[in-house]
A protein has these predicted regions:
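Acidic, metal-coordinating catalytic segment for phosphate/diphosphate chemistry
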Residues: 1-16
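Residue-level preference for beta-strand/loop junctions
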Residues: 9-11, 36, 81-83
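Short, well-ordered beta-strand micro-motif
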Residues: 19, 86-90, 116-119
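Conserved Nudix-box catalytic region and its N-terminal flanking loop in Nudix hydrolases
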Residues: 21-61, 160
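Nudix hydrolase/Nudix homology domain
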Residues: 35-36, 102-160
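Hydrophobic pocket-lining residues within nucleotide cofactor-binding pockets
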Residues: 45, 91, 120-123
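Active-site segment of metal-dependent pyrophosphate-handling enzymes
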Residues: 64-104
């Protein structure tokens, strides 16, 4: 029997910011390789940077917002040695979110298309899955909201 050779591929760790204001979640509309989806601000952790610093930097770059870490929400360790960190982040009410940029994505058609505040029922089930992965259920109010749905799961945007 021939032994299978595995090649290690380095993938840097990522960090994301979960920002909630007035019951809405700060989301980004992204079109990447022809696929449109909604996600939270975040990206790769740079050398010498902590996961917390990365989450705040990404929030500033992508949404134009200065934030403060409230607490860590989740850490997911990957098979390739990388990790995904998520943090609940507070942003002052006097700041307006703007569609920023991703310095790693240059060109005339960047993937980040729009920054917007969305309620949970406005987010499709497939995009919501990533919010659960990032620990949204531990943010005040969201566990109760999901429980209030009972056995029904909504599928906003179905048929779009």
């Amino acid at each position: 029997m021939q032994e299978k050779e595995y090649k290690y591929v380095y993938k840097r760790s990522r960090s994301v910011a979960i920002v909630v204001r007035d019951g809405k979640i700060l989301m980004e509309r992204v079109v990447y390789f022809g696929r449109e989806f909604y996600t939270v601000p975040g990206g790769g952790i740079e050398e010498g940077e902590t996961p917390e610093q990365a989450a705040l930097r990404e929030l500033k770059e992508e949404c134009g917002l200065e934030g403060k870490i409230i607490r860590p929400l989740a850490v997911q360790y990957k098979y390739d040695g990388s990790a995904e960190y998520s943090f609940e982040v507070e942003v002052s009410e006097d700041q307006e979110a703007i569609t920023g940029y991703d310095p790693e994505e240059t060109g005339e058609n960047p993937p980040l298309k729009e920054v917007l505040w969305m309620s949970l029922d406005e987010i499709s089930e497939k995009d919501r899955a990533f919010l659960w992965f990032y620990g949204l259920l531990t943010v005040d109010g969201y566990f109760e909201e999901i429980k209030s749905w009972g056995g029904e799961i909504s599928y906003p945007g179905e048929g779009m």
